[in-house]
Structures are given as structure tokens and as C-alpha cells.
């Protein structure tokens, strides 16, 4: 007899369970819950500890600022809309010892989900009024079909994410039924869930078995038991990811043949020695890692990440030189013409003493016939461009290396087109100035090798950062800083988050700031750049800024990552609390690229101070104003926002981790590698991969390939 596998349980649909009619089953399917496997992997978002539930008369001053849970019955539901159209819903909830009021602000439609006479669990921070009455604001509320249900669930009651039309109580009962099925012997099955880890691995690592984990994640007897279950299930997710990425790499290597290069190390050494500056240790390490990859029979897939101004382009130049000297073409694709031109200028400088021919192809280049002929004829050289490089009429016949700058700015299909035009799969180098936390890198770029440049070139002056409030005295300081930099013939960036002010926000709009600076600095050229302008207008303004004909550029967030204006020495970020930490760091990096001492001002919204913004906003501003290391800031960003928002579907193109948390589980991530190596040595990796395909379908094509 064997235990039931997750694949077997995935074939048992929820409409076969008692109490699941067509409507309820339909609601569950909308939340991607259709099988027993889906259901047992629908993890609680929290547990209510029955031992810590308070009656109303037990809530006192010592509970203020703590989360308190109480059980009661709804005695009244009311909705009130203020003159400013703010919707306030109030529930009166009573138990045998008293009554509390719970209020929700905004369109949460609490009144449509909760009725008088229903039993509920309420969790939140209580406020005790001068009259002695107790009030909760925006608390968590859960419905229980019957108070008696609580006596059957043990000390810790699981509370599940919201599913429209299905209560937490119904989900609890369904999961109990599912676990009961799993625990019941039947024909060829013994109790339990088949474990991808052997009992030896489980024992050696002192972790829960899979069956124990699924039982205890939902219905733990203690918090410690819940933690052990969570750790095992999080570990499994990391093992699945590792399996997927190892198979991605293996599949890519087996299916694709890379270019064959012939280059002498002495040739590269001479090129590096002739550079006008000495490379940092991490630059040297990065280019050597790339050259080692280029020697392999299979194509390279490598991410080159480095902080703002760390010198990624010169590392790319060394790779370009090696590939072109072996008789191949190199394509470098940038997201905008301004950035493409900047790469053209930088690489012209780095490669000026070589015989490398550099070609430029963008939509605005008028005579493109010669470049197009060079591409189709397979003429070795560097081809720098934008989306024009992947147009239908562009056919590379001898492409050895593809370099993609700021990969997240291109769609998956666009990136693939540049690579798939060749019979031999070109090597791929992706460059990004957005440092990725080591814990997040696995889930975003797990199928790429990673090179990191984590130090700045020597002699570069650090940018001085200031955090100013929006109060009058600090506003004057901002203008004083502007005058100082303008007197030194420097240029200034002023960045705002939005074009227009809305009725619901007092945020400074770009037009308003533009008028303010225009009136204040009448002897200087102040220009406005915003997202509603055409592509050509934005490109022309950025060129004018590069040429030095603009003194102050007031802009919404359309300043390109990587834009290089050495004469810009002051960055002012208005309403800085409205920006993400990574955005703030990238914007700061637009200055400090020349010899002048540069400064960055993080300016809080007008009339506001640190005490008036959110706790998360304060953490961001304190971090950015005291730290300059992009890698450290990326780790802090992960801690503040959480993995879901950092990796997100939009960034990674995948929805992945259900229970693992990259902020806190780095130890499990490391452990997953050790365990996966054990699995490989036992030739069990195929089984793990099959489970990964079942549980992480977004990583796979319709035919099951990665």
C-alpha cells in the first residue's frame, strides 16, 4: 500500500465533497480552488488563539495598542455617509458582559456581509473612550455559523483569505473533510500524503513529514506546531523552485547550441590594461565570469547587476570586444533612444582603440540601409539600438551575443524575438541597475547566473542626501540649495509623482512646481517634462538637458534609469514619501555622475512632516537618507514591503510562493539547496519536478515544458 500523492488528490474535485453544490463550487473555482490539493494548500492567513480571547469586560487600558480578539453577536448594523462622501459602517457587537462598536471607513460593504444576530470573531486594537465605551476601527471580522463551532476546532482557530460566497467556517469544514479522506485507509492507499522527501532526510533535518505539515498548518495544537508546519511547507516551495530552475537550465543547455568563440586571454588582458582607469575587484570578477560562460558549448544566460554608477557598461565592453574579435555580431538593446545614444557614446570611448565597428539603429535613424545590410550579411560588429533591432525586417545572420539593458522594460516576446532569429542560440547578458535582494533573485532570475558589481569606482564622490519636511523653513532651504548649485553653473532635476492634483490628494503637481520654480528663478531656463508628452517631445527635452541648455528640469517620473548628465548636481524629489524606496534610490543616482559634489533632497509634501506620514513612509525616508548602498536598500525594501509586492506578477510574470516569505526564510532557501542535492543523489529529482509542474503551472507551457 502507498500514501496518496498530491497528483492523485488533485483529481478529487471539491464538488465531490459533502456540502459543495454547484454555486459554492463555482465560487471556489474563481479563487483557483477546485481540488483537494488546492484546498489543503489554501493556507490560513492567521489563527485566533481561543486561550487569548477576551470577554468585553476584560478589555482595559493595558490592551490599547495591542491586538485583541473577542467573540460576540451582532446587535445592530448602521451605515452613514459624511458630507465629504466618506462611508462609515458601524456594527454593535455584544457578548454576555457588554457591548462594543466596530467602525469601518470607506466602501468595504460590511453591511452586505454581516447581519444582526450573527456570531462573529473581532480582532483589532481597541480604543477606550472617556465614557468607558470601547470602539474598534477597521478591525478584522470573521463570521462563525455557530459559536458552538469554536469548541470543536481546538485552541487555534484558522482564519482563511476571503472567498466570495464561501465563509471561513465552510472552508474550515471542507479542509477537515479533506484531511479526513487523506487519513482514511482505502483499497491500495494507506493513511497520509506521499512525501517527496525520504524519512531519512526528514529525520536528519528534524522537519515535519508532509502529512504532519498539512494537518498542523490548518489545525495546530500549539503555535510551535504551526511554525514547524509552515517551515516544512515553505521549504517544499523553495525545493520546487530550485527543481524548476535546474530543469530550465538543463533544458536550455540540451536544446540550444551556443556560438563558438576563439579568443586569447592575452588579447583581453591587453584590452583591459589599455582602459583609462583600473577596474574594481567586482568588475574584474564579473567580466571573468562572463568570459568563462562564453567558452561553454551551450549559450550563456547571465544577469549583470550593479548599483547606479558601478561601471556595468565597461564590463559589457570587454565581453563585446571578445565576441567581435571571434568574428561574431553583438546586439545591444536599450529601452529608449536617449539610453541607446548614451551607450553609443560610452562604448565608442571604451572601444576607440580597437577595430570594433559600432552601428546605431533606432526608429529615428533616417538612412538605415547600410546598417540593415551589415546585419543581414553577418558583418561582425556592435549593433546598438532600441525596439528597431527586433522589427520584422531585421535579420541577424551571425549573432553571437545579445545584451539587454534594463530587461524589465521589454516584454518576454520582444526579448525572445531577438534571440530566436538565429539558428545558433546567441549568448545573453541582461544588465540591470536595480539591485535585487539575494533572497528575491531566485524567484525572479532563477534560470540566470548572476554577476554582481557591489562597489563603486574609486574617487567617485558620494552623493550627500538631505531629508526636508514640507514646512516653510525647510521649503526655503530647498531654494537656497538650488541657488547654490545654479551659481556653480550646475543643472538641477526636480521630480514630482503626478501631473495633476486630484480633489482627494494635496500632493504637489508637476505644473504647480514648475510655475513655482519659474517664478523663483526667472534668470534661468526651467522646463517641464511629463508623461502626457509625446515620445519625440520627451526625447528632445532630455537631449537639451544633456546638451546643457536647460538649467532646471521639472519632471514627473519619466527620467530614464541610467541617463547620464554629468553637469546635473542637485536632485530634488518632491513628495518623497509617495515614492518607493527603489524609485528614490534610482532617482538619486541621476546626479553624482560628474566631478562636482552632488546632493539629493528628499522633500516631504508641502505642509507635512515626518510625524504626519505613514510608518512605512518614515522607514523608507530614513533608510534612503542615511544609506547609499543599493543592495542594502533592496533588502530593506523587501523587509518593508514583503516579497509579494517586490517580485509581484508584473515584475516576475509569475505567481509563485504561497507560504514561503523571502524576508524571513533565507535559511530555508539555503537548506533547500542542500536537500535538493540529496534528492538528486537519490535520483528522485524527476518526481519533485513532476510535483513542481502540478503546483507551479505558471512556469510551464501548455505542453508541460518550461
Model-derived segments and spans:
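C-terminal helicase module of SF1/SF2 nucleic-acid helicases/translocases
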Residues: 473-491, 509-706
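SF2 helicase catalytic motif II
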Residues: 389-430
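Conserved motor-coupling elements within RecA-like helicase/translocase cores
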Residues: 364-383, 391-399, 535-551
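ASCE P-loop NTPase motor cores of helicases and related translocases
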Residues: 232-383, 389, 517
Amino acid at each position: 500500500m502507498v500514501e496518496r500523492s498530491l497528483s492523485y488528490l488533485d483529481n478529487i474535485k471539491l464538488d465531490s465533497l459533502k456540502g459543495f453544490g454547484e454555486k459554492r463550487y463555482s465560487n471556489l473555482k474563481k479563487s483557483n480552488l477546485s481540488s483537494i490539493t488546492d484546498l489543503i494548500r489554501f493556507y490560513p492567513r492567521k489563527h485566533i488563539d481561543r486561550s487569548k480571547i477576551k470577554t468585553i469586560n476584560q478589555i482595559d487600558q493595558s490592551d490599547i495598542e495591542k491586538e485583541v480578539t473577542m467573540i460576540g453577536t451582532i446587535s445592530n448594523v448602521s451605515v452613514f455617509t459624511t458630507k465629504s462622501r466618506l462611508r462609515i459602517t458601524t456594527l454593535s457587537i455584544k457578548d454576555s458582559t457588554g457591548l462594543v462598536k466596530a467602525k469601518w471607513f470607506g466602501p468595504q460593504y460590511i453591511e452586505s456581509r454581516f447581519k444582526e444576530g450573527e456570531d462573529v470573531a473581532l480582532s483589532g486594537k481597541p480604543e477606550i473612550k472617556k465614557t468607558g465605551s470601547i470602539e474598534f476601527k477597521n478591525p478584522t471580522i470573521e463570521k462563525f455559523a455557530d459559536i458552538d463551532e469554536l469548541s470543536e476546532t481546538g485552541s487555534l482557530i484558522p482564519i482563511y483569505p476571503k472567498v466570495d460566497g464561501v465563509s471561513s467556517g465552510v472552508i474550515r469544514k471542507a479542509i477537515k473533510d479533506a484531511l479526513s479522506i487523506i487519513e482514511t485507509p482505502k483499497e491500495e492507499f494507506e493513511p497520509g500524503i506521499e512525501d517527496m522527501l525520504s524519512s531519512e532526510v526528514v529525520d536528519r533535518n528534524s522537519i515535519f513529514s508532509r502529512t504532519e505539515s498539512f494537518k498542523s498548518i490548518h489545525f495546530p495544537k500549539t503555535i510551535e506546531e504551526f511554525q514547524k508546519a509552515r517551515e516544512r511547507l515553505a521549504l517544499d516551495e523553495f525545493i520546487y523552485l530550485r527543481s524548476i530552475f535546474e530543469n530550465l537550465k538543463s533544458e536550455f543547455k540540451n536544446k540550444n547550441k551556443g556560438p563558438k568563440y576563439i579568443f586569447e586571454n592575452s588579447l583581453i588582458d591587453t584590452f583591459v590594461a589599455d582602459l583609462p582607469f583600473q577596474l574594481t575587484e567586482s568588475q574584474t570578477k564579473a567580466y571573468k565570469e562572463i568570459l568563462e560562460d562564453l567558452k561553454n558549448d551551450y549559450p550563456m544566460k547571465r544577469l549583470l547587476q550593479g548599483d547606479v554608477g558601478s561601471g556595468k557598461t565597461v564590463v559589457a565592453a570587454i565581453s563585446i570586444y571578445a565576441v567581435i574579435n571571434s568574428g561574431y555580431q553583438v546586439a545591444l538593446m536599450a529601452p529608449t533612444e536617449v539610453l541607446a545614444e548614451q551607450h553609443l557614446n560610452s562604448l565608442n570611448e571604451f572601444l576607440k582603440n580597437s577595430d570594433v565597428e559600432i552601428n546605431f539603429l533606432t526608429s529615428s535613424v533616417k538612412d538605415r540601409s547600410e546598417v540593415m545590410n551589415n546585419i543581414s550579411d553577418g558583418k561582425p560588429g556592435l549593433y546598438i539600438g532600441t525596439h528597431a533591432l527586433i522589427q520584422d525586417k531585421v535579420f541577424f545572420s551571425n549573432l553571437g551575443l545579445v545584451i539587454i539593458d534594463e530587461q524589465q522594460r521589454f516584454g518576454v516576446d520582444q526579448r525572445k524575438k531577438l534571440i530566436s532569429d538565429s539558428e545558433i542560440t546567441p549568448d545573453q547578458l541582461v544588465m540591470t541597475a536595480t539591485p535585487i535582494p539575494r533572497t528575491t533573485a531566485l524567484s525572479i532570475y532563477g534560470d540566470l547566473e548572476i554577476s554582481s558589481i557591489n562597489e563603486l569606482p574609486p574617487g567617485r564622490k558620494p552623493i550627500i542626501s538631505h531629508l526636508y519636511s514640507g514646512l516653510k523653513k525647510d521649503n526655503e532651504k530647498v531654494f537656497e540649495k538650488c541657488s547654490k548649485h545654479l551659481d556653480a553653473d550646475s543643472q538641477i532635476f526636480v521630480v514630482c509623482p503626478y501631473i495633476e492634483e486630484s480633489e482627494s490628494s494635496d500632493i504637489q503637481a508637476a505644473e504647480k512646481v514648475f510655475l513655482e520654480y519659474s517664478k523663483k528663478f526667472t534668470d534661468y531656463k526651467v522646463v517641464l517634462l511629463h508623461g502626457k508628452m509625446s515620445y519625440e517631445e520627451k526625447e528632445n527635452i532630455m537631449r537639451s538637458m544633456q546638451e546643457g541648455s536647460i538649467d532646471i528640469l521639472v519632471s514627473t517620473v519619466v527620467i530614464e534609469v541610467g541617463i547620464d548628465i554629468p553637469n546635473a548636481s542637485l536632485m530634488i524629489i518632491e513628495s518623497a514619501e509617495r515614492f518607493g524606496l527603489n524609485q528614490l534610490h534610482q532617482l538619486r543616482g541621476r546626479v553624482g555622475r560628474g566631478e562636482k559634489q552632488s546632493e539629493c533632497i528628499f522633500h516631504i509634501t508641502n505642509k507635512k512632516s515626518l510625524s504626519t506620514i505613514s510608518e512605512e513612509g518614515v522607514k523608507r525616508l530614513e533608510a534612503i537618507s542615511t544609506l547609499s548602498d543599493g543592495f542594502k536598500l533592496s533588502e530593506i525594501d523587501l523587509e518593508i514591503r514583503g516579497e509579494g509586492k517586490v517580485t509581484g506578477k508584473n515584475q516576475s510574470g509569475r505567481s509563485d510562493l504561497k507560504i514561503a516569505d523571502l524576508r524571513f526564510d533565507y535559511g530555508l532557501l539555503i537548506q533547500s539547496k542542500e536537500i535538493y542535492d540529496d534528492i538528486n543523489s537519490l535520483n528522485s529529482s524527476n518526481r519533485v519536478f513532476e510535483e513542481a509542474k502540478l503546483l507551479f503551472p505558471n512556469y510551464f507551457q501548455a505542453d508541460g515544458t518550461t
